[in-house]
């Protein structure tokens, strides 16, 4: 079956995990290039061993590769700052861009929430690993209630799974995730916190989601959450609730003070998640890699399927 060649810029943890997923699991994509800036990186060495064209000269090196003209889709797994530069060049060259950094130049995309709604945009943004894991839960509460006043997420990932790109983007992570909690999650106000856990042996990715909502019943909220978990599990099998959803009534007689909002009452929902990785590159504790790369692959595969249909027509 014909496949569309793609390139990955960024040979770190996320880029390498994505490469392995494409080679093992993609229905409509094939690796055309792996791009890095460190000639000694494990990702480039692994790509070369697997027969993938490689360059350690960044995007300039990618453009020099003889098969660059055949590459239709480029995944950027570098950093928010680098993506701005890379995207400008790739758009001029007519490439479809999947952004795995928190740069958020293109529209936010979380497959379980907005599916293929942005599939034809020249650049789509995959939010962040914490956003991919938690924002579906905020959305699940929102669709079962009249309003979600506050959505707050805490993403705890193993320090070992966070490469230099992730560490350089902590501020962008919190800003982009907070914004996406509001835009995709439907919360009126969003807040995001990331924790790099240095524990040894490394701990699996854990996420906690807090919402304060009005309207809707506990039963309808819980069912909506379970349905959303099932939707995410279709492309991330290791995604699951860590324990039963917790509820707490915040009455008018004892309201909570929300920053920038004031005193509020409603139903507080606490959702605890665990994301186990598929261990394609790093071990299973790195669920943060898995949920990000799986979401990007699903979106790209759907786009590639559409392109192949157009070419066949």
Swiss-Prot record:
Swiss-Prot/TrEMBL catalytic activity: acetaldehyde + NAD(+) + CoA = acetyl-CoA + NADH + H(+)
Q: Which Gene3D superfamilies match?
A: Dihydrodipicolinate Reductase, domain 2, NAD(P)-binding Rossmann-like Domain
What is the E.C. number? 1.2.1.10
Q: Which GO terms describe its biological process?
A: catabolic process
Q: Does the keyword Oxidoreductase apply?
A: yes
Q: Per its UniProt entry, which superkingdom is the organism in?
A: Bacteria
Pfam families xrefs = AcetDehyd-dimer
Q: Where does NAD(+) bind?
A: 11-14, 161-169, 288
Q: Which InterPro entries match?
A: Acetaldehyde_dehydrogenase (IPR003361), Acetylaldehyde_DH_C (IPR015426), NAD(P)-bd_dom_sf (IPR036291), Semialdehyde_DH_NAD-bd (IPR000534)
Q: Which residues form the active site?
A: 129
For molecular function, the Gene Ontology terms on record are: acetaldehyde dehydrogenase (acetylating) activity; NAD binding
Keyword annotations:
Aromatic hydrocarbons catabolism, NAD, Oxidoreductase
Concerning its family, UniProt says: Belongs to the acetaldehyde dehydrogenase family.
- This one is known as Acetaldehyde dehydrogenase
Species of origin reads: Methylocella silvestris (strain DSM 15510 / CIP 108128 / LMG 27833 / NCIMB 13906 / BL2)
């Amino acid at each position: 079956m014909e496949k569309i060649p793609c390139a990955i810029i960024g040979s770190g943890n996320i880029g390498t995990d994505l490469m392995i997923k494409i080679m093992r699991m993609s229905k409509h994509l094939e690796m055309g290039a792996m791009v890095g800036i460190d000639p000694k990186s494990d990702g480039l060495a692994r790509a070369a061993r697997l027969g993938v064209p490689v360059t350690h000269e960044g995007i300039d090196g990618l453009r020099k590769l003889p098969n660059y003209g055949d590459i239709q889709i480029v995944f950027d797994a570098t950093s928010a700052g680098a993506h701005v530069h890379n995207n400008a060049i790739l758009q001029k060259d007519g490439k479809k861009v999947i952004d795995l950094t928190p740069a958020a130049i293109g529209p936010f995309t979380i497959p379980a929430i907005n599916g293929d709604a942005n599939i034809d945009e020249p650049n789509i943004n995959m939010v962040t690993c914490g956003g991919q894991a938690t924002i579906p839960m905020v959305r699940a509460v929102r669709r079962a209630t009249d309003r979600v006043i506050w959505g707050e997420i805490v993403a705890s990932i193993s320090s070992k799974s966070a490469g230099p790109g992730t560490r350089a983007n902590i501020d962008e992570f919190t800003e982009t995730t907070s914004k996406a909690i509001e835009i995709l999650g439907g919360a009126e106000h969003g807040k995001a916190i990331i924790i790099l856990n240095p524990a040894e042996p490394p701990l699996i990715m854990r996420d906690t989601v807090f919402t304060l909502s009005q309207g809707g019943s506990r039963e309808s909220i819980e069912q909506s959450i379970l349905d959303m978990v099932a939707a995410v599990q279709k492309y991330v099998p290791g995604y699951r609730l860590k324990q039963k959803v917790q509820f707490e009534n915040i009455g008018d007689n004892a309201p909570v003070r929300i920053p920038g909002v004031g005193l509020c009452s409603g139903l507080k929902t606490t959702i605890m998640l665990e994301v186990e990785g598929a261990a394609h590159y790093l071990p299973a504790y790195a669920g943060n890699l898995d949920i990000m790369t799986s979401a990007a692959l699903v979106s790209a595969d759907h786009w590639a399927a559409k392109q192949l249909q157009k070419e066949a027509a």
